[in-house]
UniProtKB/Swiss-Prot annotation:
Full protein name: Protein ElaA
Stored CDD domains: NAT_SF
All residue ranges annotated as the N-acetyltransferase domain in the record: 7-151
Family recorded in the similarity comment: Belongs to the UPF0039 (ElaA) family.
Top-level taxon of origin: Bacteria
GO molecular function, one term: N-acetyltransferase activity
Organism: Escherichia coli (strain K12)
Length: 153
């Protein structure tokens, strides 16, 4: 069973921040062989939030939600990760459901954007995202911009 947390950046403990940065580095930098500066200055600003999934005290799933100060900009989901050990167990679906619940709870009138790795386009489409850009390369990996309009309850 995965325990989920939805935390404003100001609620993150040092150990939670360390765990999320460690998981992001393990997947995006090491596993995907993509050397880039992951710590981009957006983790601890504004109304940004972090979705963390824990199993046996280990961080196994994570997503970051960026809320721009510009009210005309969409909410942006990024850094979506499931640890290698739990892939194929539908943890990604749980993570996206929790992440979108957070977006709807905190910003019910805001569309949502994400830059998806292109091979995950169908996964994100299953959550109501549609492509809004052509495929582009980011850090040597094909990506596609996708958006989800406001869903009225």
């Amino acid at each position: 069973m995965i325990e989920w947390q939805d935390l404003h950046h100001s609620e993150l403990s040092v150990s939670q921040l360390y765990a999320l940065l460690q998981l992001r580095c393990a997947v995006f930098v090491v596993e995907q062989n993509c050397p880039y500066q992951d710590i981009d200055g957006d983790d601890l600003t504004g109304d940004n939030r972090h979705i963390l999934g824990w199993k046996n005290d280990e961080l196994v799933a994570y997503a970051r939600i960026l809320k721009s100060d510009d009210d005309l900009e969409p909410v942006v989901i990024g850094r979506v990760i499931v640890s290698e050990a739990l892939r194929g167990e539908k943890v990604g679906q749980q993570l996206m459901s929790k992440t979108l619940e957070t977006c709807t709870h905190h910003w019910p009138d805001k569309p949502v954007y994400l830059g998806a790795q292109a091979h995950l386009q169908n996964f994100y489409q299953s959550f109501g995202f549609i492509p809004v850009t052509e495929v582009y390369e980011e850090d040597g990996i094909p990506h596609i911009g996708m958006a989800r309009e406001v869903i009225q309850a």
